[in-house]
From Swiss-Prot:
Bridged cysteine pairs (disulfide): none
Superkingdom of origin organism: Bacteria
Keyword rRNA-binding set for record: yes
Subunit record text: Part of the 50S ribosomal subunit.
Protein name: Large ribosomal subunit protein uL22
Compositionally biased tracts (Low complexity): 117-140
Pfam families: Ribosomal_L22 (PF00237)
SUPFAM superfamilies assigned: Ribosomal protein L22
Keyword Ribosomal protein: yes
C-alpha cells in the first residue's frame, strides 16, 4: 500500500469530495482515465495524486486499486472586498489537502460453495370465513329481556 498527499490545493473541499467519492475502489488506470474527461478543477489534482501514489509504491497503474481518496479542509485564505459606504465584506478562499491510498489488487480465487436448496414452500390455500352473526344493539337486547 502506498500513499500520496497533496497539500494546500486552492480548491473547496466540498467540491473535491464529490470527485473523490467517484474514484474510490476503482482500478487506478481506469480512475485516471475517467478523471481525464471530467470538467472539474479537482479532477486534475486527484488524478495527479493517484499517479503519484502509484509511482511511490513502484506499481503499474493497471495492477492497483484506489483504496481510499480523502479530501480534508486546509487553511482558509481570508480576503476583503470593498463595499458601499466604506464598508467591506469578507471573502473566504478555502484550500484542501488530498490524500490518496492505493493498494495492490487482490485476485480472488473462486471457491465453489455448495448451497443447500430450500424445500419449495407449500401452496397456500385460501379459506373463506363464514359471515359473522349480526349482533343486536344493547338497548334492544335489554328491552327484549325485560318483556
Amino acid at each position: 500500500m502506498s500513499k500520496a498527499l497533496i497539500k494546500f490545493i486552492r480548491l473547496s473541499p466540498t467540491k473535491a469530495r464529490l470527485i473523490a467519492r467517484e474514484v474510490q475502489g476503482m482500478n487506478a488506470e481506469l480512475a485516471m482515465a475517467s478523471l481525464k474527461f471530467m470538467p472539474n478543477k479537482g479532477a486534475k489534482y486527484i488524478a495527479n495524486a493517484i499517479s503519484s501514489a502509484v509511482a511511490n509504491g513502484g506499481f503499474e497503474a493497471n495492477e492497483v486499486i484506489v483504496k481510499s481518496c480523502r479530501v480534508d479542509a486546509a487553511a482558509v485564505l481570508k480576503r476583503f472586498r470593498p463595499r458601499a459606504r466604506g464598508s467591506a465584506s469578507r471573502i473566504r478562499k478555502p484550500t484542501s489537502h488530498i490524500l490518496v491510498e492505493v493498494a495492490k489488487a487482490e485476485v480472488k480465487a473462486e471457491e465453489k460453495k455448495t448451497v443447500a436448496k430450500k424445500a419449495p414452500a407449500a401452496k397456500k390455500t385460501t379459506t373463506t370465513k363464514a359471515p359473522a352473526k349480526k349482533t343486536t344493539s344493547t338497548k334492544k337486547a335489554t328491552a327484549k329481556k325485560e318483556s
